[in-house]
Amino acid sequence: HFSLDSECHPYIEKMIQTSGISHSEIEMEFDRLLMKEDYINPVRYLSTGHIHPSIENGEVIAPFYEDLTPQIIEKCMKSMIFYHKVLLAPGKTKRKLLFGGMKLIGAYDGMHGMVMSLEPNPQCRDYCRLLKRLFAGAVPLAAGLIIQYQKKLFQGGELPSRFHRTFGAGEKWEELRL
């Protein structure tokens, strides 16, 4: 996940600034592309099947986050599933309610991309192709980072600078070509 996001987010930031399309809509369109390639209906698919809320899983995750308890982690996992279910809207009525509520509270522009659209946004077609190429490159990158991390763990020394990137846009995203 770190490899993919740290590779893609600078480009996504450039896409946002170039097109005005929100981060969530660009990622939603990329999710659609990946699901369609696997013959999954993106409008009906609940993508939280891999999340298993429990105190035991919370105990595994909590040490990675300062000030979070296993109970808070479990609650977060339950909330993630709940909100994904809220935003899963294959039917007209629920879609109208969701989008109407978003407009009512002034959050439509930032949030509508969290609900899978019925049809792809044609403005995102080329962006998704670029993200697919970056996705393909992130897999070997992740494998290499894992090896570098293990080497650091077992042999000491400094982490390579690649580990200092964040999930954000980073530096020089403005110079990227789409």
PLM-predicted stretches and their roles:
Residues 5-178:
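N-terminal leader/auxiliary helical segments
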Residues 1:
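Long, contiguous binding/interaction regions
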